[in-house]
Amino acid sequence: MMAAGPRTSLLLAFALLCLPWTQVVGAFPAMSLSSLFANAVLWAQHLHQLAADTFKEFERTYIPEGQRYSIQNTQVAFCFSETIPAPTGKNEAQQKSDLELLRISLLLIQSWLGPLQFLSRVFTNSLVFGTSDRVYEKLKDLEEGILALMRELEDGTPRAGQILKQTYDKFDTNMRSDDALLKNYGLLSCFRKDLHKTETYLRVMKCRRFGEASCAF
């Protein structure tokens, strides 16, 4: 039985994901640059929180506590996104231009669209896992938001950038297999890490451009 605190957090994350983001996306052309950044940061934050909560619930449910540290130091936990030149934290992100950070964010988002599209078929008996279709929709919306920012910064004529041809594997539906559990555990860990990177990059860009007092994070 989950504690009240984590379940409340998960319910809140799910409620936030149900907000009418598509209305915002449809209004992108008429929005100011500051509003575009504000909305992109907000939804990256929501998705990162849900990714973290999903990872934690999976870990509590399927991975014995004594095995967690050793598993995360194996090839299972390796994220192929680590092979692209993506900053690993705020300080490194500040050395990149806004367009560079947007392109990297787009690569990270697009690498998950395939694996997440059918995630709900894997986790059918959980409140959080069952929201994966919603996560896919919101990830698509965030992709559109990032593309809108790129159009604004490139004066409406986006240039061709790096193409990430490799994507993550699909989640394994055979939850009775130890190999499948380890694979899914590694994928959820990578999803959490990649969403954290995306949120960090967007927050760095927003704070750098608009110098808000709340930029500390």
UniProtKB/Swiss-Prot annotation:
Pfam families: Hormone_1. GO terms for molecular function: growth factor activity; growth hormone receptor binding; hormone activity; metal ion binding. Residues 1-26 form the signal peptide. Disulfide bonds join 79-190, 207-215. InterPro entries: 4_helix_cytokine-like_core, Somatotropin, Somatotropin/Prolactin, Somatotropin_CS. Gene3D superfamilies: 1.20.1250.10. Keywords: Disulfide bond, Hormone, Metal-binding, Phosphoprotein, Secreted, Signal, Zinc. One of its GO terms (biological process) is positive regulation of receptor signaling pathway via JAK-STAT. Zn(2+) binds at residues 46, 199. The modification Phosphoserine is found at residue 132. One of its GO terms (cellular component) is extracellular space. The keyword Signal applies. It is found in: Secreted. Belongs to the somatotropin/prolactin family. Plays an important role in growth control. Its major role in stimulating body growth is to stimulate the liver and other tissues to secrete IGF1. It stimulates both the differentiation and proliferation of myoblasts. It also stimulates amino acid uptake and protein synthesis in muscle and other tissues. This is Somatotropin. It comes from Bubalus bubalis (Domestic water buffalo). The gene is GH1.
